[in-house]
Curated annotation (Swiss-Prot):
NAD is among the record's keywords: no
Entry's localization field: Nucleus
Region (Disordered): 45-71, 83-141, 198-221, 241-272, 285-325
GO biological process terms held by the UniProt record: mRNA processing; RNA splicing
Name the record gives this protein: SURP and G-patch domain-containing protein 1-like protein
Positions of SURP motif repeats: 142-185
Species, as recorded: Arabidopsis thaliana
Main location: nucleus
GO CC field: nucleus
Lineage: Eukaryota, Viridiplantae, Streptophyta, Embryophyta, Tracheophyta
UniProt keywords, alphabetically: mRNA processing, mRNA splicing, Nucleus
């Protein structure tokens, strides 16, 4: 190496590594001096440390660790390529300034937390603002009407409307609770419920001032006509314009009693879903009105002969076979029931006997009248004979022996099972014989 050359000029004489090691040792000595000066600085002790100071000391620990780590890095001469970051020396005034800044930052954190606590209240106030109405006027009208109906009659009406109107209908916003139209509907529903609760409260206060009698008479919310008649509101009422209550009740009764031309089994074709819903609601109400009341399981149904001709099983094309009691003629059935302690049948039998009584046009009645007999007197010269005529039905025509009784003859002391058995025997006796086959009388 040429000693006359300046040290900054690189000389390619093979002593490059030795030169580089000397430079690194000089840099390490300079940095060790800087660290010793910083460690020899007097430490400031505070008698009553503030909570902010504690937090500051905790926040400064990583810097101390970095300094110690830097010191260790300087002492390791093998890692010569790792250069520590430059150390900035600060005075005690700088440390005080940092304390003030940390205290200000701690206060700003508190303010941010308070602002975060206040934001839910502000957001709740903002939620009271009405959402924008739907752009489609039909959807807006449907949402308003549906909100009023649901507020009056409960959430089940909304579920029924959702089930009855699937697909692309004006009610499609019910299937997406996050859309703007559904939020508008929920807002309108809350307004309607609030209005109804206010009217109820005002009605209760008014009735309390008027007295107990007027409170029972004055009802804040009267039931609509469709609830009194058991008729459900059709969904097409959501489209109709409000009319007078009297006219609406009359039109509802007329629509129930008088079916329209569009009432067919296929329903109105090419109509909107609301008209279809109204049609099916009206049809269900008519079927419910025409449905017969259910009979108790313990009660024995009346025979088909006592029912209407359209209700008999023989005229029903959907049923096969017959009940044995259907073949009993009405006259025979009346006689049978009159012997079963049936009050209605006994009364009917007495009325029939009065109508079938022998009148003055009878030949025997005329003959006895010529002989001086009067109605109510006995036969004979002493007027003490038989007064009542002999009934032809009591004559024995079944060739029974002496002391024998007919097994199918009903008695008042028979129970319901014995009466039913004998009634079936009577029906078998009068069973039809369309082919005219000879039959033996079993009873």
């Amino acid at each position: 190496m040429d000693k006359g050359a300046p040290p900054s000029i690189f000389v390619n004489d093979g002593s490059f590594m030795e030169r580089f090691r000397q430079l690194q040792q000089e840099k390490d000595k300079d940095k060790d001096k800087v660290v010793q000066v910083e460690d020899s600085k007097p430490v400031k002790i505070i008698s009553n440390p503030k909570p902010a100071a504690n937090k500051i000391s905790i926040g400064l620990k990583p810097n101390d660790a970095q300094k110690k780590g830097g010191k260790l890095a300087f002492s390791l001469k093998q890692k010569s390529k790792l250069l520590a970051p430059p150390v900035k020396l600060g005075t005690e005034e700088d440390e005080d300034d940092e304390d003030v800044k940390h205290e200000q930052g701690f206060g700003s954190v508190k303010r941010q937390k308070l602002e975060q606590r206040d934001t839910p209240v502000k957001s709740a106030k903002v939620s009271d603002v009405a959402p924008p109405p739907p752009s489609d006027p039909t959807v807006k009208k449907v949402a308003d009407k549906l909100a009023s109906f649901v507020a009056k009659h409960g959430r089940p009406f909304e579920h029924i409307t959702r089930q009855k109107n699937p697909g692309d209908t004006p009610f499609k916003f019910l299937f997406d609770e996050n859309c703007a139209d559904y939020k508008y509907y929920v807002f309108r529903l809350a307004e309607e419920e609030k209005l109804i609760s206010q009217t109820k409260d005002s009605g209760v206060l008014h009735s309390g001032d008027a007295g107990s009698r007027t409170s029972t008479a004055a009802i804040p919310l009267q039931k609509p006509a469709y609830q009194q008649t058991g008729y459900q509101i059709p969904a097409s009422a959501l489209y109709d314009t409000p009319v007078e209550p009297g006219a609406s009740s009359r039109s509802a009764q007329a629509s129930i009693t008088r079916p329209s031309d569009s009432d067919s089994f296929s329903g109105p074709r090419g109509a909107d879903p609301l008209s279809m819903m109204e049609f099916y609601m009206k049809k269900a109400a008519q079927e419910e009105k025409m449905r017969r009341p259910r009979q108790s399981k313990d009660e024995m149904p009346p025979p088909a002969s006592l029912q209407g001709p359209s209700e008999t099983s023989s005229t029903d094309p959907g049923k096969r076979g017959h009940h044995m009691g259907d073949y009993i003629p009405l006259e025979e059935l009346d006689k049978f029931l009159s012997k079963c302690n049936d009050a209605a049948a006994q009364k009917a039998t007495k009325e029939a006997a009065e109508k079938a009584k022998i009148q003055a046009d009878n030949v025997g009645h005329k003959l006895l009248s010529k002989m001086g007999w009067k109605e109510g007197e006995g036969i004979g010269s002493s007027r003490k004979g038989m007064a009542d005529p002999i009934m032809a039905g009591d004559v024995k025509t079944n060739n029974l022996g002496v002391g024998a009784s007919a097994p199918g003859e009903v008695k008042p002391e028979d129970d319901i099972y014995e009466q039913y058995k004998k009634r079936m025997m009577l029906g078998y006796k009068h069973r039809p014989n369309p082919l005219g086959n000879p039959r033996k009388a079993y009873y």
